[in-house]
């Protein structure tokens, strides 16, 4: 489950799901990604998710992180940011699904190159889901999206 601008919507849906036997990992972005230095998730929400058996993981943005810090100061784009923009051609949620899958892979929370379902959304709740076999960020191009389960129409 990915972060979005309105995490409460996705997290409320999660509370309604029967997820016994399914590992759910909430992957969030580190401070500063959206221009503010507060945590993206409140302590209360994190505790609620953990009480539901959800693993909560916060890390640097896999498809920008330090590279965006350089490009915002020095100008231009680095290759990782270009790859992120290319993924957005398919859909913002697809880009986020790829990104959070790699972040979870980097942390050892999912098996490398084994299929998982990644769910993401940007701004309006979870609206995109893919089956992906994630690679770690150091092997970004080895990640494979096997299926797009759902995504909103691009407008």
Feature annotation, model-predicted:
Residues 1-155:
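Conserved mixed alpha/beta catalytic, RNA-binding, or beta-rich assembly cores of soluble enzyme
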